[in-house]
Design a protein with these regions (language model features):
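Trp- and S/T/G-rich repeat-edge/linker motifs of beta-rich repeat architectures
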Residues: 1-6, 22-45, 65-88, 110-134, ...
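Short beta-strand motif characteristic of blades in beta-propeller domains
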Residues: 3, 7-24, 50-64, 91-109, ...
């Protein structure tokens, strides 16, 4: 974990396999989620995390180990079921206000998505499945901004992200996972780097220094972040 409390700036980031615009992190808007920090420190590892602005949180360790706080019941039921079936959690996302969520898992070698989302997003997911596409990441907010990532590199997104998604692929290759904030910003983890339209400067500081290409980057509009290699190494500020 790196202390981001005193940091804040606006700048373009173009270094260490990361590209995009950093916006000033304001520490006066930060309310800690101590549970998530305690859980990661106790386990000494974290593979994926998802969290809201109001304190809802979930951390995944290993294939399907988990710690959670105030998860929506539907999301918790999915996590418990994957754990019971000894599956693997592929990606998780919770919207900043905690009203929408997604869980992508692999159970018995089959990729499965579960989500609480808008009808438009459900229609996109079902259409991709009908084309034989497997979903590996679904990120969204309460305003129906979204990015869907398939295992073959196919993406679907709301119109506002089309340019960002195209530029991310051109610069860093296949998109692996996504994050969308309440303000309609997105972060895209790719084969060769991380591309974003806007990211809090607290997270940008880590991306400029981390010694691996992140597999997951989760952020909120107000500066919380989780950045990991998809295995055991992570940086976080909750």
């Amino acid at each position: 974990m790196m202390d981001a409390r005193m940091r804040g700036y606006n700048a373009t980031v173009n270094e260490n396999h990361s590209y995009g615009r950093a916006i000033r992190y304001d520490p006066t808007l930060h309310t800690p989620i101590g549970f998530l920090t305690d859980a990661i420190q106790k386990a000494n590892e974290a593979r994926i995390a998802a969290f809201s602005r109001n304190g809802i949180g979930l951390v995944i360790m290993g294939n399907n180990g988990y710690y959670y706080y105030q998860l929506p019941q539907g999301m918790l039921d999915v996590i418990l079921d994957v754990n019971k079936k000894e599956g693997r959690i592929i990606d998780i996302n919770i919207t900043e206000y905690g009203k929408r969520w997604s869980v992508i898992s692999r159970v018995n070698n089959k990729l499965i998505w579960n989500a609480l989302a808008s009808d438009d997003i459900y229609n996109k997911l079902n259409a991709l499945n009908s084309q034989g596409k497997d979903i590996v990441s679904l990120a969204m907010n309460e305003y129906s901004d979204y990015v869907i990532v398939c295992d073959d590199g196919t993406t679907e997104c709301s119109p506002k992200f089309e340019s960002t998604v195209r530029q991310a692929k051109n610069k860093f290759g296949k998109i692996l996972s996504a994050c969308v904030t309440a303000l309609g910003n997105c972060v895209l983890c790719c084969d060769r780097g991380v591309y974003f339209n806007y990211i809090p400067s607290s997270a940008a500081d880590i991306l400029k220094k981390v010694d691996y290409i992140p597999r997951y980057v989760k952020v909120t509009s107000y500066g919380r972040y989780f950045i990991s290699d998809g295995n055991t190494r992570s940086y976080y500020w909750f």
